[in-house]
């Protein structure tokens, strides 16, 4: 990552949402904050439900020239006209997703706290890797990624890196010099005004 370039915002959807209401919030966000990519982290297991949720968001995102990727379901991504897929299992299915979607698709991989897993994902064709959480949390085993993983990666590896999970203004300010993207989602959706909360978090990027 170039130290002269500020990290970009990668927006993660809530796991469930009303498409019309979500698109209204997205319109506000797009008007206020530059968004590099939107990820649909939909928890639904019904193909029809995923399609109903994806279609209006795709139309809106593409109208604003914002790429849209889908969590996990890489077999659906191309059919739905999406730009790619985000995988949560590290390097395990990157090669299969790349084979299914081709070279032009965006394929990202969440690699938890493991630098080795991130390197493996990159070798298998990932376009970016995400590590996290970066802050203290009580989810899973409670582990958080060490800052030196980002320091080493940003100094050594050209593949873009994403900071994800337990983001707050202090963590964002700390990691801004050593990451390419901040994946922001759960941090804003419980707020009455998600767009305003996103802007508040993004202020920590510009403050560095």
Regions picked out by a protein language model, each given a short descriptive name:
Residues 1-91, 99-127, 141, 152, ...:
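Conserved N-terminal beta1-alpha1 strand-loop-helix module at the mouth
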Residues 181:
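C-terminal binding/interaction regions
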Residues 144:
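Acyl-donor (CoA/ACP) binding surface of acyl/acetyltransferases
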Residues 131, 162-166, 184-186:
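Glycine-rich beta-strand-to-loop/alpha-helix junction loops that act as flexible
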């Amino acid at each position: 990552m170039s130290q002269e370039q500020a990290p970009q915002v990668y927006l993660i959807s809530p796991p469930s949402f009303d498409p019309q209401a979500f698109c209204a919030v997205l319109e506000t966000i797009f008007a206020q904050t530059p968004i590099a990519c939107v990820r649909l982290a939909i928890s639904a297991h019904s193909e029809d439900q995923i399609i109903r949720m994806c279609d209006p968001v795709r139309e809106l995102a593409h109208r604003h020239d914002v790429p849209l990727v889908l969590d996990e379901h890489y077999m659906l991504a191309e059919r739905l006209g999406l730009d790619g897929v985000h995988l949560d299992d590290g390097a395990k299915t990157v090669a299969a997703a790349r084979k299914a979607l081709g070279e032009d698709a965006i394929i990202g991989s969440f690699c938890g706290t493991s630098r080795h897993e991130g390197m493996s994902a990159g070798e298998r064709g990932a376009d970016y890797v995400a590590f996290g959480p970066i802050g203290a949390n009580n989810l899973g085993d409670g582990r958080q990624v060490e800052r030196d993983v980002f320091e080493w990666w940003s100094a050594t590896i050209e593949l873009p890196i994403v900071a994800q999970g337990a983001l707050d203004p202090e963590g964002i300010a700390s990691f801004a010099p050593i990451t390419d993207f901040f994946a922001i989602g759960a941090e804003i959706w419980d707020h009455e005004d998600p767009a305003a909360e996103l802007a508040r978090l993004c202020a920590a990027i510009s403050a560095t």
